[in-house]
Amino acid sequence: MLMMFYWSLPCFLFLMGVFVFVSNRKHLLSMLLSLEYIVLNLFFLLYIYLNLMEYLSFLGMMFLTFSVCEGALGLSIMVSMIRTHGNDYFQSFNVL
């Protein structure tokens, strides 16, 4: 019963993060925050899986390293867009 709770809570939180990501598409910063929330829930699921299967824990550290790099890259893109366009609204600039 407890193991089912360990799997269902991160899955529910992941789905809530995806819902926020899909429904809140006006600002780039809110989208980046919801992406970081999704990555954090994926790390929680990975941590549970690695502890359950008794794998090595360095895979979790690699995942966190790549997610931090993804967050820094997203913030640098946001800063460059704010410098060129003046805000982080998606409607004010054409990315394509």
UniProtKB/Swiss-Prot annotation:
The keyword Chaperone is annotated on this UniProt entry: no
Known catalytic reactions: a ubiquinone + NADH + 5 H(+)(in) = a ubiquinol + NAD(+) + 4 H(+)(out)
Listed transmembrane segments: 2-22, 28-48, 58-78
Primary location class: mitochondrion
Keyword Ribonucleoprotein set for record: no
Membrane topology: Multi-pass membrane protein
Any one GO BP annotation for this protein: ATP synthesis coupled electron transport
One GO MF term attached to the UniProt entry: NADH dehydrogenase (ubiquinone) activity
Localization (cell): Mitochondrion membrane
EC number: 7.1.1.2
Any single GO CC term annotated in Swiss-Prot or TrEMBL for this entry: mitochondrial membrane
InterPro entries: NADH_UbQ_OxRdtase_chain4L/K, NUOK/Mnh_C1-like
Keywords: Electron transport, Membrane, Mitochondrion, NAD, Respiratory chain, Translocase, Transmembrane, Transmembrane helix, Transport, Ubiquinone
Summary of the function given for this chain in its UniProt record: Core subunit of the mitochondrial membrane respiratory chain NADH dehydrogenase (Complex I) that is believed to belong to the minimal assembly required for catalysis. Complex I functions in the transfer of electrons from NADH to the respiratory chain. The immediate electron acceptor for the enzyme is believed to be ubiquinone.
Family membership: Belongs to the complex I subunit 4L family.
Protein name: NADH-ubiquinone oxidoreductase chain 4L
Organism (species): Ceratitis capitata (Mediterranean fruit fly)
Phylogenetic lineage: Eukaryota, Metazoa, Ecdysozoa, Arthropoda, Hexapoda
